[in-house]
Amino acid sequence: MRTLFDNIPLEQMNTSMTINATAPWLLSLYIAVAEEQGADVSKLQGTVQNDIIKEYLSRGTYICPPKPSLRMITDVAAYTREHLPKWNPMNVCSYHLQEAGATPEEELAFALATATAVLDDLKGKVPEEHFPAMVGRISFFVNAGIRFVTEMCKMRAFVELWDEICAERYGVEDPKFRRFRYGVQVNSLGLTEQQPENNVYRILIEMLAVTLSKNARARAVQLPAWNEALGLPRPWDQQWSLRMQQIMAFETDLLEYDDLFDGNPAVDRKVAALKEGARAELAQIDSMGGAVEAIEYMKSRLVDSNAERIMGIEDGGTTVVGVNRYQEAEESPLTAGDEAIMVADKDAEADQLARLATWKDARDDTAVQKALEAVRQAAATGTNIMIPSIEAAKVGVTTGEWGDVVRAAFGQYRAPTGVSKNPSNRTEGLEEIRAQVDAVSDKLGRRLKFLVGKPGLDGHSNGAEQIAARARDCGMDITYEGIRLTPDEIVTAAKAEEAHVVGLSILSGSHIPLIGELMEKMRAEGLGHIPVVVGGIIPEDDADRLRAMGVAKVYTPKDFELNRIMIDLVGLVDAAPLAAE
């Protein structure tokens, strides 16, 4: 943190940190650096995302169980009220909910339920007279998809529902504290690997949803790069997205007019329908005891909604240009050559480990251990975790060490996968594949066993969930234990479950080292006969390397027909040699 903000006066900055499970710690580091600079901490401005509930539902960067994690969220909020009054202690993030398949009604409801869970917990931690101002410091980070009229109506619904909740649930009288403050990144889920140049238009259209309506306009907009379905965007790609915003803001006349949609009956009807659907979901969540108690319910709803979305693309009910219609295309000069995407520096990890070792060698170990014990005691006794965390930051405690302490205090958590063992009601049209699965299962003498795994730290689980759910509906016996598995854990599970095929999902870019390690361990355990398939954001050169390691099939976003993948799996198992006796 000190290196990052070297010669940058934090007292004059407004810093936003997309950090969740370790939000108390990152804010502590920031405060420690600000104090080193001689800053007046009360003048610090910024935001920590600090939304752990969406991590359980969609993004996966959680550490501890929900209840102690909620406690740490409100510890941050209570501390900022007293010491950093200009800081936004939470940015409720519905962006990832839509990326995980949420309908507009679900995005509205799940985000608002998250906000109320936090505010309900915060009530006892701040003086009553200061609570309305704390409500006013809650901000949101939302998504905007291609159906931009519906998305614009969703934003108007967000504004109205939040005002209603603040007034009726929390008794906030000042309209300033009931304002729905939000930033946005438009949808990445809909960006396509096929004809990726079309993504430029998708991104621009999606931006309209959060800019056209003045009364529901985003305070901040960030746009993905056109080639994110291919790999990591280059600086030039990111610049192109920035230019879209600048042209919209400075060349058009959009910002010169009042709201263009006030009084429009079609818009009013859609907003009312979205609010009605969101209220029904909110009532369901409240009946379960709130967002924390309803995590498993919300996760299953997201998996089901995403399955419906994918089936719509597969059966042609939802048109995606270049994917399931208008597939003929000229070769794009934008994707030609080896430098069409950015490749991570292979030496970065070793460099970071070396710098970490140097850092640890230079600090006072006695002071570090004393500080960690203070964090441990705060976690155990319910004292605000921020106070000892700031002291720990000052003596050089690392993020990993802080995380180890809270993990030991509160426990390690595995979130629900949203994929049940029971088939869904979406088996229509799967009869032929189910018959193939039955036939192969008969030959095997037991049900075809498919192990789905997500190795590494990648928490984006949509693909793994949908593959597991479709395989289940096709009649396979599935095992899917969720995210953050080590190669050792996957190999152990493959052996224990006597898997017939292993499927791995990796979207972090670390597919080469992780798959290389896993394939070696599979062979060492006598499991080299089991076919392994891999899916993710995988450039073709890397796909060739994976196949050379022994991977049977490699899938990327262009392989959107899940039934085709299921047929491949059946064929691989049918052709695979039996294990040696």
Please provide the spans of the model-predicted regions:
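Catalytic alpha/beta active-site cores
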Residues: M1-G145, T150-E151, R169, K176-Q185, ...
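Secondary-structure transition/capping motifs at alpha-helix termini
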Residues: D6-M13, A32-Q45, A78-N88, A117-G136, ...
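Short beta-alpha connecting loops at secondary-structure transitions
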Residues: T15, K54-C64, L97-G101, V142-R147, ...
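Mobile "lid/hinge" segments at catalytic clefts and subdomain interfaces of large enzymes
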Residues: D51-I53, S69-K125, Y201-L282, M288, ...
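Short beta-strand/loop segments at the ligand-binding rim of alpha/beta enzyme cores
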Residues: R178-Y182, R446-K449, E525-V534
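Flexible, glycine-rich loop/tail regions that form catalytic "lids" or insertion modules at the edges
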Residues: R234-P235, S241-Q246, F250-E432, P487, ...
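Cofactor-cradling patches in redox/metallo enzymes
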Residues: A464-V570, D574
